[in-house]
Each structure stands twice: as C-alpha cells, then as structure tokens.
C-alpha cells in the first residue's frame, strides 16, 4: 500500500497534506525517515510513525445507514444528493460505497463500506442473502396473493421470482402492510412483485440484510458503524 494512502486513511489529512508531513521528515518507517509518499509499506509487518506516534491503520469501514427518501444510493451525482454526501469527511476518506442499492423513494437498511469482497458476497445471486422489507400497499391483499408472492410471480421480461417469504402485518382498508423477504435483487423487484398480484407499493423500507437488522434508534439519514457481532453475522455463510 502506498504511504500516502495509508496516512490519509488513518486521519492524517488529504494526500496533499500528508505529502507535506512526509517532506517535513515527520514520518518514519521502521525507524527510518520516509522519503516519498509513493513508497509502499505493509502496515501488518512495518511500523509507521508520525511525529513519534505509531499509526493505527484501519483498512475498511462498515456503516449501517437508515437511508432516507429522496437520496440516491450512489457515491456521487452531479445533480442529486447521494448517501455518501451524508457522511463526514473523515468517513469519506475511506471511499465507501453502498453495497447494493435502494430506490430513491425507498428508506431503510443500507450498508456503506469499502470492503469489496464483503459487498460482492452480499450481492452475489449465488449467495441467496435474504433481505426483508416492510411493504405498504395501496389495496388489501388476499391469502392467495400472499401464496403467489411466496411461490414466485412473473415480473418484467417474463422472469419468475424465486421463492420468497411474505407475512401480513395489517390488512385494513387503506392500511395494508406486509413483510416480504426475498433472496435476489432484480430492478424494482418488490414493486414489480406487488404489481404482479394487482397491487401497488406506496411506501417501502428495508428492515434487514442477511442476519443483521436496521437499528431502530437510527432516524432516516442517520448511520453508525457496525458492531463486531453484526460484521461477523454479515460474513457468515447464509443458510
């Protein structure tokens, strides 16, 4: 890893700023002054110090966000606010990205990380990682519709969705809410599944991903780091 990236990720400023620190002779690698920010170092085997203090290097960041409506699940956009725009400069220096996406009008659990391997495992169709949604529907839903959602319905392109789990929370006129758990992530899948049974989604929130649930203490737009236990659960093979 390049020295400037290590120092920037460890909170010593931008790459331009750490270049000045190195030039000032304040950075040591195994007791010897660093000469160039382009120098490669191994934080696992080499000791790097700045002004005599050991650098506590951290490679990855894992953030659980309650994504708000109206914000894009993207790293950048020239016209609209993205989930990364909600982060602090200290967190943005890790260059996190959303692991998967939620529609602009969808709220709920979104993982932001720079761990590409974890993101790939969570998003790979072969891994069958379950994702549970709270789905508010325009009309009441029948038991037959629930059965169809669970066995699979045909959506755009003639694709039949994989088996899902559907549970009715409330089924009153004007207040129909179901919990829907799917193991794939086709474009607008939940909305398309509702449409396939003659209904319409009016509000959508992702409650969980894998074995990790959204922290109820997080208001829309708020986020926190994953706990060690939550990270362990995300890394575990899915049943």
From Swiss-Prot:
Domain of life: Bacteria
Domain S4 RNA-binding, chain residue ranges per copy: 1-65
Catalysed reactions, as listed in the record: a uridine in RNA = a pseudouridine in RNA
Gene Ontology molecular functions: RNA binding; rRNA pseudouridine synthase activity
Active site: 103 (nucleophile)
Enzyme class (EC, first level): isomerase
Keywords from the UniProt entry: Isomerase, RNA-binding
Gene Ontology biological-process annotations: enzyme-directed rRNA pseudouridine synthesis
A Pfam family that the UniProt record links to this protein: PseudoU_synth_2
EC id: 5.4.99.-
Stated family: Belongs to the pseudouridine synthase RsuA family.
NCBIfam families: pseudouridine synthase
Protein name: Uncharacterized RNA pseudouridine synthase YtzG
Gene source species: Bacillus subtilis (strain 168)
Gene designation per UniProt: ytzG
């Amino acid at each position: 890893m390049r020295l400037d990236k290590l120092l920037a990720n460890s909170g010593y400023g931008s790459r331009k700023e750490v270049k000045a620190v190195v030039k000032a002779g304040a950075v040591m690698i195994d007791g010897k002054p660093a000469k160039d920010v382009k120098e490669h170092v191994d934080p696992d085997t080499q000791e790097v110090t700045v002004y005599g203090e050991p650098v506590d290097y951290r490679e990855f960041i894992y953030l659980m966000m309650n994504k708000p409506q109206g914000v894009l699940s993207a790293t950048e956009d020239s016209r609209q606010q993205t989930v990364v725009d909600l982060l602090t400069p200290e967190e943005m220096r890790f260059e996190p990205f959303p692991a998967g996406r939620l529609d602009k009008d969808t709220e709920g659990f979104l993982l932001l990380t720079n761990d590409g391997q974890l993101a790939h495992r969570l998003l790979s169709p072969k891994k069958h990682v379950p994702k549970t949604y709270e789905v508010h529907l325009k009309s009441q839903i029948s038991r037959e519709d629930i059965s169809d959602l669970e066995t699979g319905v045909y959506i755009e392109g003639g694709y039949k969705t994989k088996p899902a789990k559907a549970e009715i929370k409330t089924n009153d006129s004007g207040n129909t809410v179901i919990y829907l758990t799917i193991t794939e992530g086709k474009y607008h899948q939940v909305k398309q599944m509702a449409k396939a049974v003659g209904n319409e989604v009016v509000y959508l929130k992702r409650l969980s991903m894998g074995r990790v649930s959204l922290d109820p203490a997080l208001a829309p737009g708020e986020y926190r780091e994953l706990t060690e236990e939550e990270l362990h659960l995300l890394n575990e093979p899915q049943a």
